[in-house]
Amino acid sequence: MSELWYTEKQTKNFGITMKVNKTLHTEQTEFQHLEMVETEEFGNMLFLDGMVMTSEKDEFVYHEMVAHVPLFTHPNPEHVLVVGGGDGGVIREILKHPSVKKATLVDIDGKVIEYSKKFLPSIAGKLDDPRVDVQVDDGFMHIAKSENQYDVIMVDSTEPVGPAVNLFTKGFYAGIAKALKEDGIFVAQTDNPWFTPELITNVQRDVKEIFPITKLYTANIPTYPSGLWTFTIGSKKYDPLAVEDSRFFDIETKYYTKDIHKAAFVLPKFVSDLIK
């Protein structure tokens, strides 16, 4: 009996391969090629344009680290925006913070939202929560129209290809600063230091010119290229490394802890060299 294997070609010379039980859905949306597959090792997985976006097995790492680092850094996050993130995982984590009154999700591709609800219910299950406002719209344009509106903005985008290209520009980061309140914080995924070191260097440079507090932190995500993933955080006022212990409270997580919050900012030398 033949086996089906799916390979994501992460660079010209490197990729990740996984055994597939069956294809759940495949579609060319208005913006990208969407695939939902059931894999033997990582459960149901979402691919966009052939790239792993999330899997049932390891999704918690990414979503917890995008959400909880800025939300514990800010003393009272009430209004939060997620740009991208149509799978709903970041929203699920945001709603674990009782201070949050409203979480807005803006994703350009409604099909990602639709099929995440269908095939990734453990990830997308909170998208229908009454505190959540889901908008199928261009995140770049949404930011451009917003001013002094959000406490925290999280950019949960794909890699800088296709519809996400504009989400890695200095103009976009300037728009985020305008959309944030005077003590606002933002975080964005910024890929990995093994295959895209220039991206990290460029994003950090641009964000540092806009936000007085700019830092890089990492997490280990098996299905993402190289397994070592980075996040850039920009803050107008609050330092993520100066959060008092009394501010941390217990939430249900699998990866994020008070100690991980601090340890994530300890970088290997070759990574810290990228942002000097």
Swiss-Prot record:
- Its Gene Ontology molecular function terms? spermidine synthase activity
Cellular component, GO, one term:
cytosol
Can you give the residue ranges of the PABS domain? 3-236
EC number(s) reported in the record: 2.5.1.16
* Entry superkingdom: Bacteria
The annotated active site, in chain numbering, is D156
**Catalytic activity, per the record?**
S-adenosyl 3-(methylsulfanyl)propylamine + putrescine = S-methyl-5'-thioadenosine + spermidine + H(+)
Task: Write down what this protein is called.
Answer: Polyamine aminopropyltransferase
Q: Which organism is it from?
A: Bacillus subtilis (strain 168)
